[in-house]
């Protein structure tokens, strides 16, 4: 939303290889290009906002601590953070419901956003949390995970795929308090009568 005059902005392809760029664009729905912000000739400041109405969380990465994040939650990162597009959770969409996850590793800072507030849970070793996939934002790569259907056939037919992720610690899990699907469904209850009346 704003930046200091000392900030130099340069645009480049997000990945070094064309295949990596295409993979991140098609599967992750991220842009081909990314802006690099560098302070030149003195200190500088840059402010970012997220598209959804919600919080922005700052995650610190190290060689022994990375994160698995929802593709749409990515906002920005420092240069030494690597976004892995070859990870199976990204290339195969293991989380279902169009939910592709990106594995972030390296040394640096990662900024993620949520729809609604961020609810952080710290899991001890062996402790498990079951999370609705539409509310899952990120979790530590030290965690184990398993995606499965929730409920019976009736719930699946009425509620969609009905997938949840079981995340087992040790590590942190970040959950968003709102989800876009529920917002769209609610908006449609308001818009549907008008659409139908105009279609007659």
Which residues fall in each region the model found?
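Composition-driven recognition of glycine/serine/threonine/acidic- and proline-rich low-complexity segments
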Residues: 1-200
